[in-house]
Amino acid sequence: PDTGEIAFYDFYGGNLAGIREKFSYLKELGVTAIYLNPIFESCTNHRYSTADYHRVDPFLGTNEEFAAFCRAAKDEGLAVILDGVFSHTGADSIYFNRFGHYDSVGAYQSKESPYYSWYRFKEYPNDYESWWGVMDLPNVEETEPSYMDFVIHNDDSVLRYWMRQGISGWRLDVVDELPAAFLRDFYKTLKEENPEAVLIGEVWEDASNKISYGEQREYLCGYELDSAMNYALRTIAVDFIMGRKEGRRMLAEMTHLIENYPPEHFYAMLNLIGSHDIERILTVLAKDADTNTLSAEDIAKKRLHLLLAWQMTMPGAPCIYYGDEAGVTGGKDPDNRRTYPWGHEDEEILSWTKELTGLRRRSDALRTGRFIPLYADGDVFAYARSIEGGRDIFGQKKEDGFFIIAMNKNTTSLRTVSVYTNGLAYGELTNALYPRMKPIRTINSRFTLTLPPLSAVILKGQETRKKRAGVLLHPTSLPSAGGNGDLGPNAYRFIDFLKTAGQSLWQILPLTPPLMGDSPYLARSAFAGN
């Protein structure tokens, strides 16, 4: 019968050498880090059923080739993040060895096995706890001392071994199933190996309020995770673009999320719109489409344009699931793991993605600038990203910049909105990606914008006016040998003094001849000098 299990054993030849050959493509796409799904030896193609934590799957390469892969990636400015699966192993593994494929004495084979204490047997050997009832994935007792030593503490632990091969961090699978004691030890040891290494958790909800198995988790308290997969923000964005939520409700949910997260975490969240665990985003966006004017495929692509503009201009680290940038479609696992369509990419989506990643890479404000909601009502959402005074949200020296991102999710109707920027914008706003387009003029910090159906625009503002200080003083009040000040040497010395004092403005009274009451405001001529 067609149980679907055969899908776990299909292999298409991808390996580390193939990824390395595509480093130039990844660089062109604007990628700075590669997050790899599990690479350790396993009998399945997804490799979440680990057989040997210390060995690269031979289908992918060797340990030596992986170390060379990391060195080459570093030379190209690419960090490597590994997927760590530590809540369960494979049944077909060195440690459990249910099928006797390994020379080791596995926990399934003998209670005398050095790995027996790692597992939770109900009735030995065939009845044991497994991940969500999948018998090929026996659960482990994560806080069992020998298991923690094996994964974390030993000099050749799984964590330390792969860090020393050159990786820059880990993404932890099903982190809510890892006990706090395990997670905190993992985090502490990771930072001992490399203080700059990153630890990312798979979290599907608000990571600041996660309750797992009755326990309030402390992911964002500084000793468990640096970041989490931002499925929560993805849900908010997709629901809005799909028309399931209107602007005000969407912004309320987003604001709630932002307020819950410390800035250090919100600006480090892994902002994804696709992953190996969910339907391909282009397939999702083709649903609930009004096909009276456009095909479902065209609507999906336009919706993706909006979502990509959002992803690449929000605080956080945008993460591209391979193939999403090329228009790959697919249903639920494993259909969402199709091969990359080399030579058959959707050039429109790929070009838009590259334009957005390039803009983000060039703009400090889009990475660590303030996030400022401007308008959220009905079908339209607009927000700003801003750095002023040469300092970003964390007080780090960055280049000033100001952007406004606006989008209309309606599939058939344009929307014209008046957006008030509360003093943020003045002068003209130009299109950040297409600067030859007609600029939009702001009046009293407000501008009017017409957005076609299913469209997004990124506007670049002039540098924010810097706050300045100065003095109000008429030249005649300056000290001078004759008693009355003038615009001679004393005035020049006064200008030097103002500069030294950090002042940048000198406002003077009119220089026209005084008339009635010795007032220069009542001069005979505005063009006469005194």
Predicted regions and their residues:
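Substrate-binding/active-site clefts of carbohydrate-active enzymes
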Residues: 1-32, 39-165, 186, 192, ...
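Aromatic-lined carbohydrate-binding/catalytic grooves of carbohydrate-active enzymes
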Residues: 4, 25-65, 186-188, 467-483, ...
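Conserved, mostly hydrophobic/aromatic
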Residues: 26, 36, 53, 73, ...
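Carbohydrate-interacting/catalytic domains
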Residues: 1-33, 300-301, 313-320, 326-506
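Short, solvent-exposed turn/loop segments enriched in Gly/Ser/Thr/Pro and often Arg
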Residues: 34-44, 84-93, 173-179, 202-207, ...
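Active-site-proximal helices and loops of the catalytic beta/alpha 8
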Residues: 70-79, 87-88, 93-104, 158, ...
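The substrate-binding groove and active-site-proximal loops of carbohydrate-active enzymes
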Residues: 2-17, 49-63, 134-150, 167-177, ...
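Hydrophobic faces of well-ordered beta-strands that scaffold small-molecule active sites
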Residues: 34-36, 80-82, 170, 199-201, ...
